[in-house]
């Protein structure tokens, strides 16, 4: 439990994203099929890309996604993440300091 639990109307899920079965986890916690915001920032950025590939975009949609890829580190995470998100209908709205991409879905 946390200090904001009584004020929150959505679940707080804490765990190791590298091991999570997102479809099962989201279903267990009654995550809506359309989620307002997803933020992804794991270390190293190659792990963030691995986790991104496991998000069930075929079932869940996010209005806004911020995805930290640390492009300035030249780890090869920028293009694969962009291709994956664009394949699922996300539009790259903004890149911040060659470090983070902001995506939106305009069809929701």
What label would you give each PLM region?
Residues 25-27, 31-108:
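Conserved acidic-Pro-Pro-aromatic motif
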């Amino acid at each position: 439990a946390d200090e904001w639990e009584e004020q929150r109307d959505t679940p707080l899920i804490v765990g190791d994203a590298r091991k999570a079965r997102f479809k099962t986890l989201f279903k267990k916690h009654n995550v809506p099929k359309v989620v307002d915001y997803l933020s992804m920032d794991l270390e190293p950025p190659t792990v963030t890309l691995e986790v991104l590939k496991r998000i069930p975009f075929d079932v869940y949609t996010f209005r806004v996604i911020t995805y930290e890829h640390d492009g300035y580190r030249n780890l090869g995470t920028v293009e694969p993440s962009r291709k994956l998100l664009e394949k699922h209908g996300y539009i790259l709205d903004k890149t911040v300091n060659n470090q983070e991409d902001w995506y939106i879905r305009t069809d929701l």
